[in-house]
UniProtKB/Swiss-Prot annotation:
Belongs to the TRAFAC class TrmE-Era-EngA-EngB-Septin-like GTPase superfamily. TrmE GTPase family. This is tRNA modification GTPase MnmE. It is found in: Cytoplasm. It comes from Mycoplasma genitalium (strain ATCC 33530 / DSM 19775 / NCTC 10195 / G37). One of its GO terms (biological process) is tRNA methylation.
Amino acid sequence: MKSEINIFALATAPFNSALHIIRFSGPDVYEILNKITNKKITRKGMQIQRTWIVDENNKRIDDVLLFKFVSPNSYTGEDLIEISCHGNMLIVNEICALLLKKGGVYAKPGEFTQRSFLNGKMSLQQASAVNKLILSPNLLVKDIVLNNLAGEMDQQLEQIAQQVNQLVMQMEVNIDYPEYLDEQVELSTLNNKVKLIIEKLKRIIENSKQLKKLHDPFKIAIIGETNVGKSSLLNALLNQDKAIVSNIKGSTRDVVEGDFNLNGYLIKILDTAGIRKHKSGLEKAGIKKSFESIKQANLVIYLLDATHPKKDLELISFFKKNKKDFFVFYNKKDLITNKFENSISAKQKDIKELVDLLTKYINEFYKKIDQKIYLIENWQQILIEKIKEQLEQFLKQQKKYLFFDVLVTHLREAQQDILKLLGKDVGFDLVNEIFNNFCLGK
């Protein structure tokens, strides 16, 4: 698909910086640029060309570099030029105004990648992966998305498509040419093949559900009695005063949250209300929220006061009952002479021992997750569920009737949905919906 519209957009973040990149793609980019430069810009010759951007009065706007990508060897498959200018947004706005005046059009979100897909430069799976790569919350998701960008998901889906196509062809031979006995296939043979495909789809679906969880931050709940320094530890981990620190017991009445990055992974810390023991058993100062935080957390830090350390066995039993890994750490080591193992001083921000242990645990946690094949978008997961349901219906409907011309309709439906998943038979409404979620300039 070749568009007649020349689109441009800022591909870098819209604030003053060292430089900016303006992407410009379409059939007439050279013609338009030659109206606003003081040198002849041609499709031949150097891939990088230096020139001045000038206005109608030949007033200099900026000294720029043009990175030229000639069709079809460009990101969009069209002639594409990236204008590298100095990083003042005043300059960017002037250049964009000139492009607009000379025939360019502001690109919609994701329009460059949409053109790449429509021009056959990448598959729909790969195009979807581009946006997810930009938005990846941690290194593991980034690596998984890169597998899709490399085409591994397409290979899996192509195999499934070929298997379903083969099933449809075998059934159609039975329907259209019943006299050719040598070509007849037993229904039991078809069923076994369908069951194998269903199992493969189930694995992809289950993997994809895991990916949703991986987009959530790794949650750590800080648990302990009142005034053991939970809020101080939260502030030390975040390197900012997120929680109120006070000597008054029970100052934290609610769960205070904060996010930080640890070795490429997004961590959410939950500072909970102090848990106090009374005759009635464990009492939650923040009502039930502290214990809800334990249930939600991937890991618990059980914080004790090093000046009078005493573990609450009932609380530890609660961790184990909920199958929660937990670290026991002793805070306020600056107030004691004999140091405990796993001791810190949150107030003094002496928490290296804890951070090292967290880093090791989180690296091991994510290392256990296999970088398998995942569907990364909701629309993909909906389609693959439909494909699985059609194949299951193929097996289920045999209890009612065994007519091949009826049963094959379920395989044909699955066949069509696989084509949609591969982007080979997809409507423009879905395509537009997918790319509207992209950022500008991509």
